[in-house]
Each structure stands twice: as C-alpha cells, then as structure tokens.
Amino acid sequence: MTQLSRRAFNREALGLAGTRMAGLLSGLQAGRAAIAAHAGLASSASITDVPGIRAGHFTDPRRPTGCTALLFDGEATAGADYDGSAPGSYLGVLLQPASPIETIHGMLLTGGGPMGLAAVPGAVRYLEEHKVGFDWGVLNVRVPIVVGAVIDDLSLGDGRIRPDADAAYKACQSASTGALAEGNVGVGAGATVGKMLGGHGYHGMKSGLGTASLRLDEVVIGALVVANSSGDIVNPHTGGIVAGARRPDGKGFANIVETLKSFARSGRRESTWLRDPALQSTTLVVVATNAEFTKTALTKIAMMASTGAARAINPYHTNGDGDSTFAISTNRVKSDLGISVIGALAADLVSATVLRAVKAASSIEGWPAARDLAPASG
C-alpha cells in the first residue's frame, strides 16, 4: 500500500486506501475459500501446481526413511525461518537476507538425522549433470545451489540405514510436475508425531508428508509439510486431536499439554515427565508461489507461514525440535498481492497441509496412523 504523507492524508487518500484494503480483504477471503476447497485429500492439490516446480521422492524399502527433492526450473528465490532449537540444514545460511546468493536451484528434504544431510550432494550431482547452476567462470563448470533440511527418523528400524547421495539422485530422477504423492513416502516415510511423552507408557503415531495448493487468478501458492513433531496434531477449527500421544491403556489421546499440567500439579517434578524431549523431532514446512518476491520478503512470508503449523501442532517449537520453514518464489508473475496477504494465505494453507500429512499416513509396526484408529473428535 502506498505510504501517504500527512498533507496527502485527505478524503481522497482515505478513499483510495479503503479501496485497496477492500481488495486485500477480498484476496484473503478468496484464498481461504480455496484452502477450504482443498482441505480434504484430493490428489490434485500439490506444491507442484506452482509453475516452475518439479518434485520427486525416494523411499527406502529397507526401513521407514527416504528423501524428497524439489527442483526449480529457472531462477528461484528463497527465504527461511528457523524456529526450532536444533535445525539440521545444508547451505541454509545462504537463505539469510545478508547472503549475496539470490538464486537456488533445488532443495532436498531428507530423513536420516544429521547424517542424512550427506544425501544432498546427490541432488547437486544430478543438477550439475543437467547443466543447472551458476556459471563459475571455469570451462564447463556449473555450481548448483541445493539447500538441504533433515528430520530425525533414526529410531524407526535400523538407524544405520539412511538416505545417501544415490537416494537423492533417484529422488531428482523421479521429479515431475505431476501431483506429489503424500503419506509414508520420501522424507515422510519416517515421520511420527506425539512423542513428547514417550518412554512413560504413552505412544506416538505415524505421520507423513502432505501437500496442497491454492490459486488466486494467476497467483498460485503451494505448501509441503513433513509433520514430525513432539506435539499433538490438532484440527485448528475444532480443537480436536487428530493424531498424537495415545494413553497407555490405548483408550484415546493423552492430550500432551493437559497431561503435563496434571503431572505438574501432582508434584511429580522429580521424574522425567517435565524434562525437555530428546532431539528427535523436526517439522519441515515449504511454501512456494509463482509471484515474484525478494529474499527478504520471502523470509517474512516464511515467518508468517510458520504460524500456520503452530495452529495445528501443540506443543510446537519445543527445545528438542529442529522446526524449519522455507518460502520459495519461482518469480513467474508480478502481483499486487503483498507480503502480508501471501503470508496469511500461506499460513492457512500450511495448517490444512499439516492435517493432510497425518491423514495420508499409513500405520507401521508400533506406530498406528490416524486413518486406522476409530474416528476422533478432530
């Protein structure tokens, strides 16, 4: 919105500002309606609906782990918001506004804990072989910038099995503009939720990867979420728990926050009930748009998008989490939709996508999924 001086702040200016504000509100309302339309599990809604993005998975058949590659056709700009206390990233520092690097060529989301970041060079190799990257001024050398982020899934199966460079290369080979598969695939293969009370008879649940998109005329916003949290997954519209910590007797959800309150009141502070969770949870969020934005603007959009996950995960950003949110622009269209509008719509889309991540998941041994339990209030 154009900034008005005091002298220009007259009735005409007020009318102009009011008209613009009405347009922004109209955009928000249209966006919320589009999000509601995609709130189910329709396979047509995907981050790959954003022009300029291809995505693919590699899912390891030996244990629940894998990786997901996002490849950008043309010059993509990105910003990030790291609100978790222990994020695992590869070249993530390049997304800071102060970095001179303005373009990235790919992103790899991977399981395997910190060691899983060793997979990222496989995506770099794939892009280099396809002549994607910065011209380094050396004959036939191009340097692709691939940002990596990791979740901890080492407790599922044999933790010595992790995504490696070959796994990332295969994820890139499978990348397409088609609808991206959801659930126990790629980096979502080892995602779980509701782990904050683990080790005390309470049990978490299987989660996965979810994706969704919305369109506002020529502007497209997409989201991808890997829900791998210490906290419960909550429907922000009803307050009901969709997936999370289950009671030791198997009769419903524990409700982590209420359980923590009850133990605090009972004076059980000498036990491990009230200690911080181990470093075993990280939720990864990617939002993308074809609307043109700078790295600084995308950093703010990432901050706003992160609040969407906080509406659906409780508690979120615990001391043991590495929660990370990325915002990407493929710079295909110029739009008058501002940072706050895109950020608000992205946050709502992220909330819906968190729910998709758990609803699309399938049970594995010891980790039931929401779809396999009796219907809950969420």
Segments (PLM) and residue ranges:
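N-terminal secretory signal peptides and thylakoid transit peptides that target proteins
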Residues: 1-25
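Alpha/propeptide regions of enzymes that mature by internal proteolysis
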Residues: 14, 35-378
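Signal peptide processing junction and immediate N-terminal pro/mature segment
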Residues: 24-37
